[in-house]
């Protein structure tokens, strides 16, 4: 029997419902329960796949190829469960599926309404996503009081009626602000938020109160009195430097035990020793390395959320504080590579569109020519190949057909644009990896023996997640290999380039997939760990050169 924990948010958005849900999931998992998490998004887009990163932040790709909310990345980083397309759905998806059923005649000519048809579809999707787990944590996106969230709130209200309070539990996350002018903590916003929730039939069982500092006992008692929540169930969650402290903070306040008590679950004590080790390693670094992330969405750091977390994870596993310098690739186009001179390593992440591309190419060239560790992910690998083709293979104006459809040397292109020497356009059968459509999800990669990639992974075959349309052009790759480009990873059928490196460079690696999606704080990821180690080595080498005595003779 699956128990359901519904997490809602009030007062303001961006309080950290995703992190709180994931942290509670980590606690319950440490208590011996199998856990899954779902995110319900109230926007009408079917999924975030076509949304601007500035609007939505990162699109997280699941193993089964779904484009989902970035909160699913938090879920996978905190718990051991692997998320699927069933773990995230939107209002748009719900309505699309209901309309499809109506067109098919499933409702036998009935009038389709929000209640019961939309709410029934929401409940069915929640049950489907929760199937097989002891506990399903269901995060409802948006803020209580928003009109967009009402169908989701009505659906979970109905689930409490249908399943009872031994199988369902409501947690409400609110803001308790500190008003500096008055010198007081204000509980009124939380009181009103709970009042709004109760007005639609939901009484929270537990409150998690977000604040700058820990709530004094008097304020917790006041909140309990006016919200009809027992005082032990009013949890204080103050700001912390690292999100990986939160499972420990919530465990120490008894949240996991409180949940198990209310849901009548017999569970063991939560063993969070691995989280303690993560936090201790993050708080006590022995080294510092500066990494430039050269991208086009750098004004919103959530656009690269999994990437920044993967770098932090690598720092945890190398006892290193990783300082991330986000650099707009258009700024490099305007001001040159001077912006890169103070960094120890350069990373160019994925992206779409031509804006800022030449700046990324300049960054790859700067790293290659100056022996600076370079990590190119997805588009970052493709622009490294473009730069190499132009400079080392004398392919003038080489490019991707995404940016220049008329380029004489399409080193990156849709598979349907590849043309063999005989003038025949490459054709793919149904079921093949199609370059003309988005290639999504986990796919196997075979690594070259004696390559850096093979040494980093420690195995000859890996599965990594993809999100791209364009591929490296096999018809031109042979010329690049003659000039020193190493193809260190290929698809299992040998037709698609998955990884590249340079043999004559200290650390220059590109991958077509997104390794950041599978990095976790407890395990890290071999490519990111190798990258940070290379950055540290480059930093030490630079210091040694600067410290060496001058060779010039003086009178």
Curated annotation (Swiss-Prot):
<feature type="binding site">
    <location>
        <begin position="186"/>
        <end position="191"/>
    </location>
    <ligand>
        <name>CTP</name>
    </ligand>
</feature>
<keyword id="KW-0067">ATP-binding</keyword>
<dbReference type="InterPro" id="IPR033828">
    <property type="entry name" value="GATase1_CTP_Synthase"/>
</dbReference>
<feature type="binding site">
    <location>
        <position position="402"/>
    </location>
    <ligand>
        <name>L-glutamine</name>
    </ligand>
</feature>
<comment type="similarity">
    <text>Belongs to the CTP synthase family.</text>
</comment>
<keyword id="KW-0547">Nucleotide-binding</keyword>
<dbReference type="GO" id="GO:0044210">
    <property type="term" value="P:'de novo' CTP biosynthetic process"/>
</dbReference>
<dbReference type="GO" id="GO:0005829">
    <property type="term" value="C:cytosol"/>
</dbReference>
<dbReference type="InterPro" id="IPR004468">
    <property type="entry name" value="CTP_synthase"/>
</dbReference>
<keyword id="KW-0436">Ligase</keyword>
<dbReference type="InterPro" id="IPR029062">
    <property type="entry name" value="Class_I_gatase-like"/>
</dbReference>
<dbReference type="InterPro" id="IPR017926">
    <property type="entry name" value="GATASE"/>
</dbReference>
<keyword id="KW-0315">Glutamine amidotransferase</keyword>
<keyword id="KW-0479">Metal-binding</keyword>
<feature type="binding site">
    <location>
        <begin position="14"/>
        <end position="19"/>
    </location>
    <ligand>
        <name>ATP</name>
    </ligand>
</feature>
<dbReference type="InterPro" id="IPR017456">
    <property type="entry name" value="CTP_synthase_N"/>
</dbReference>
<feature type="binding site">
    <location>
        <begin position="146"/>
        <end position="148"/>
    </location>
    <ligand>
        <name>CTP</name>
    </ligand>
</feature>
<keyword id="KW-0665">Pyrimidine biosynthesis</keyword>
<dbReference type="Pfam" id="PF00117">
    <property type="entry name" value="GATase"/>
</dbReference>
<feature type="binding site">
    <location>
        <position position="222"/>
    </location>
    <ligand>
        <name>UTP</name>
    </ligand>
</feature>
<dbReference type="Pfam" id="PF06418">
    <property type="entry name" value="CTP_synth_N"/>
</dbReference>
<dbReference type="GO" id="GO:0003883">
    <property type="term" value="F:CTP synthase activity"/>
</dbReference>
<dbReference type="GO" id="GO:0019856">
    <property type="term" value="P:pyrimidine nucleobase biosynthetic process"/>
</dbReference>
<feature type="binding site">
    <location>
        <begin position="186"/>
        <end position="191"/>
    </location>
    <ligand>
        <name>UTP</name>
    </ligand>
</feature>
<protein>
    <recommendedName>
        <fullName>CTP synthase</fullName>
        <ecNumber>6.3.4.2</ecNumber>
    </recommendedName>
</protein>
<feature type="binding site">
    <location>
        <position position="71"/>
    </location>
    <ligand>
        <name>Mg(2+)</name>
    </ligand>
</feature>
<comment type="function">
    <text>Catalyzes the ATP-dependent amination of UTP to CTP with either L-glutamine or ammonia as the source of nitrogen. Regulates intracellular CTP levels through interactions with the four ribonucleotide triphosphates.</text>
</comment>
<comment type="subunit">
    <text>Homotetramer.</text>
</comment>
<dbReference type="GO" id="GO:0005524">
    <property type="term" value="F:ATP binding"/>
</dbReference>
<feature type="binding site">
    <location>
        <position position="13"/>
    </location>
    <ligand>
        <name>UTP</name>
    </ligand>
</feature>
<feature type="active site">
    <location>
        <position position="514"/>
    </location>
</feature>
<comment type="pathway">
    <text>Pyrimidine metabolism; CTP biosynthesis via de novo pathway; CTP from UDP: step 2/2.</text>
</comment>
<keyword id="KW-0460">Magnesium</keyword>
<feature type="binding site">
    <location>
        <position position="71"/>
    </location>
    <ligand>
        <name>ATP</name>
    </ligand>
</feature>
<feature type="active site">
    <location>
        <position position="516"/>
    </location>
</feature>
<feature type="binding site">
    <location>
        <position position="469"/>
    </location>
    <ligand>
        <name>L-glutamine</name>
    </ligand>
</feature>
<dbReference type="GO" id="GO:0004359">
    <property type="term" value="F:glutaminase activity"/>
</dbReference>
<feature type="active site" description="Nucleophile; for glutamine hydrolysis">
    <location>
        <position position="378"/>
    </location>
</feature>
<feature type="region of interest" description="Amidoligase domain">
    <location>
        <begin position="1"/>
        <end position="265"/>
    </location>
</feature>
<feature type="binding site">
    <location>
        <position position="13"/>
    </location>
    <ligand>
        <name>CTP</name>
    </ligand>
</feature>
<feature type="binding site">
    <location>
        <position position="139"/>
    </location>
    <ligand>
        <name>Mg(2+)</name>
    </ligand>
</feature>
<feature type="binding site">
    <location>
        <position position="222"/>
    </location>
    <ligand>
        <name>CTP</name>
    </ligand>
</feature>
